[in-house]
A protein has these predicted regions:
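A charged N-terminal "starter" segment
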Residues: 1-118, 380-384
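Conserved, mostly hydrophobic/aromatic
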Residues: 39, 62, 93, 153, ...
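Active-site loop ensemble at the mouth of alpha/beta enzyme cores that anchors a bound cofactor
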Residues: 206-207, 239-318
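Glycine-rich tight-turn/loop motif centered on a GG-T
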Residues: 23-35, 100-103, 118-127, 199-209, ...
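Flexible, glycine/charged-enriched surface loops at secondary-structure junctions
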Residues: 56, 222-231, 342, 357-360
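Active-site-proximal beta-alpha core segment in soluble small-molecule metabolic enzymes
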Residues: 60-197
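C-terminal accessory subdomain/extension
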Residues: 291-384
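Active-site loop/helix belt of alpha/beta enzymes
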Residues: 150, 156-270
Length: 384
């Protein structure tokens, strides 16, 4: 593994935020910290669900972009492999030791296709397709490299992004793949990404039910043409319990469940309660850097320390103070009772975990108030 498990020549506060054994209060801020107990519980919980349903979990590495975390999910959570969104991300994760990867996206640039074929020499490599000409390019690259690339036909099952319409367009593309040298038709990709953060349970369920019906009908049409789906993939943290019980999806692609974020705390279950089976495990560790006003404090985690596309962060475990505004390098904390002091530490739950992880080089694993491990964000910034 790539984790730093003992002190090294890295310089705390310059190129790494902490060292093994350090007290959490001494970690350089802002830092991305993981509550290891909560993280491990989340991984086990998803692993238990998958095992109970008799299906597979291909954990989505776009959340964490870390080879160490991917390997942990495989070893301790029963994941069969990982998803990545870009070729470069997949290359970094495979270089870190993962041997089964799905690029759950379209790869159409010829140079990137060439790299994808190179990846297939080192790991099981699967890619999504939604275009006949793209199949030709993938086939040519696979033949040239002497490899086999597995392909999933992507269905647009409601997200309005990539993918063909369900039914006959899927069958036509699957036939094209199956007859192309260097390629294998391995199934379908049907991820309803737009439903994951729909807060209302019945609305979310309705969107996934519609996707499940499209997938069920399409799988039947493929089977009628002797085209078997080894993978029927999709599902995310906000919907996995629907697809997992559908009887047609056999490979979940959840990512955020390991960390959770502030927006997922707004997603409701059937009873109208906030979904709480997974715990918050990811936090931005920040320090109060200025306290010149009685009713406000300024912390060192601003826009450059997080993504706020899904809203501002929530201060974990506190109701007396609130994160209310941010600029590039500063966060404004409402402190009506004048409680905070210089250098006080706060744990922020990011509004959106995935893009927040992409602005850090390191995860700092914390247990019992001490730094237990340092994991590099292996594929940080690899968006090609």
């Amino acid at each position: 593994m790539n984790a730093i498990t003992k002190n090294s020549d890295l310089v705390v506060g310059y190129n790494v935020p902490a060292e093994i054994g350090m007290d959490a209060n001494d970690v350089a801020t802002p830092a991305l910290i993981i509550d290891l107990d909560a993280f491990e519980k989340n991984v086990k919980l998803m692993g238990d669900f998958i095992k109970q349903k008799g299906i597979r979990h291909r954990a989505h590495a776009k959340t964490h972009k870390s080879a160490d975390i991917a390997l942990y999910q495989i070893e301790h959570g029963g994941a069969c492999g990982v998803c990545c969104q870009k070729v470069s991300e997949a290359e970094a994760i495979v270089a870190g030791g993962v041997k089964d990867v799905l690029v759950s996206n379209q790869v159409v640039d010829l140079k990137k296709i060439e790299r994808l074929a190179g990846l297939a020499k080192r790991a099981r490599t699967i890619v999504c397709v939604d275009d006949m000409d793209n199949v030709n390019d993938l086939s040519a690259a696979a033949v040239k490299a002497g490899v086999t690339i597995e392909c999933l036909v992507e269905i647009d099952c409601g997200a309005g992004r990539c993918g063909v319409q369900w039914g006959q367009p899927v069958v036509d593309l699957a036939k094209k793949i199956a007859s192309s040298d260097g390629l294998t038709f391995s199934g379908i990709q049907a991820y309803q990404g737009a439903a994951q953060h729909v807060h209302d349970f019945e609305v979310r369920k309705g969107q996934i039910d519609a996707a499940v019906q499209q997938v069920t009908d399409t799988v039947a049409m493929l089977k009628a043409e002797s085209l078997e789906c080894d993978i029927v993939g999709g599902a995310g943290t906000g919907s996995y319990y629907f697809e997992g019980a559908s009887g047609v999806y056999n490979e979940m692609q959840c990512g955020s469940y390991i960390f959770m974020d502030a927006d997922y705390q707004r997603v409701l279950d059937k009873s109208g309660n906030f979904i709480s089976e997974f715990e918050n495990a990811l936090f931005i560790w920040t320090s109060v850097m200025s306290k010149t006003k009685k009713d406000k404090a300024i912390c060192d985690a601003g826009l450059k320390a997080q993504s706020v596309d899904s809203g501002l962060p929530v201060i974990f475990g506190r109701t007396d103070v609130e994160y209310i505004k941010c600029s590039d390098e500063h966060g404004v904390i409402s402190d009506p009772d004048n409680i905070l002091k210089l250098n006080d530490k706060l744990k922020l739950i990011p509004g959106h975990c995935d893009p927040t992880c992409n602005v850090y080089d390191w995860y700092v694993g914390i247990r019992n108030g001490k730094v237990e491990c340092l994991w590099p964000v292996t594929a940080r910034g690899l968006a090609f």
